[in-house]
């Protein structure tokens, strides 16, 4: 039986486009205005800092010889396809899950674009306290983490709230 795309979770794919535009736009601005390693303080404990990540989160496998570029690209494609299928199978009214899936897809595709186009992921957000700096990250990473947090949150909600 065929169903209208608007009645499925695919109705939320617009959010993927929004995440991609914001993520790729921010990376473009960094690439056009920063040299590698440049830092600009924004607020206490927050800098813009241009870094290249050849690995995954926390530069995992960054110095592994190049194969990891294709490995992480494959993971991003696989997860995106799985989440699109899950969105298709869910109802548009299941907002929390569909928003979470769209955020994760948008973030995964933003970093996938970087890997395929540049050979690395552009990172620029440097959060720090005193001399301690968290791993530099980007808006795609933020979207993925917020999406994952929403999925966890959804698991704690009562059944009635999950259906909406």
From Swiss-Prot:
Membrane topology: Multi-pass membrane protein
Keyword Metal-binding among UniProt keywords: no
Catalytic activity, reaction form: Release of signal peptides from bacterial membrane prolipoproteins. Hydrolyzes -Xaa-Yaa-Zaa-|-(S,diacylglyceryl)Cys-, in which Xaa is hydrophobic (preferably Leu), and Yaa (Ala or Ser) and Zaa (Gly or Ala) have small, neutral side chains
Pathway: Protein modification; lipoprotein biosynthesis (signal peptide cleavage)
Compartments reported by the entry: Cell inner membrane
GO biological process terms held by the UniProt record: proteolysis
Origin: domain of life: Bacteria
GO cellular component, one term: plasma membrane
Annotated keywords: Aspartyl protease, Cell inner membrane, Cell membrane, Hydrolase, Membrane, Protease, Transmembrane, Transmembrane helix
Active-site feature positions: 123, 141
PROSITE patterns in alphabetical order: SPASE_II
NCBIfam families in the record: lspA (TIGR00077)
Summary of the function given for this chain in its UniProt record: This protein specifically catalyzes the removal of signal peptides from prolipoproteins.
Family, similarity comment: Belongs to the peptidase A8 family.
Protein name: Lipoprotein signal peptidase
């Amino acid at each position: 039986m065929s169903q209208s795309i608007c009645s499925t979770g695919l109705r939320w794919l617009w959010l993927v486009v929004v995440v991609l535009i914001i993520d790729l736009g921010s990376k473009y601005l960094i690439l056009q205005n920063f040299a590698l390693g440049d830092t600009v303080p924004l607020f206490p404990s927050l800098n813009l800092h241009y870094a290249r990540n050849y690995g995954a989160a926390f530069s995992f496998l960054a110095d592994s010889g190049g194969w990891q570029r294709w490995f992480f690209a494959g993971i991003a494609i696989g997860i995106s396809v799985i989440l699109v299928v899950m969105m298709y199978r869910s109802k548009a009214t299941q907002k929390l899950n569909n928003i979470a899936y769209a955020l994760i897809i948008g973030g995964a595709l933003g970093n996938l674009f970087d890997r395929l186009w540049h050979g690395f992921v552009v990172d620029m957000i440097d959060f720090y306290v005193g001399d301690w700096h968290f791993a530099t990250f980007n808006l795609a990473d933020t979207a993925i983490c917020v999406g994952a947090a929403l999925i966890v949150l959804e698991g704690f909600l009562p059944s009635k709230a999950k259906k909406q």
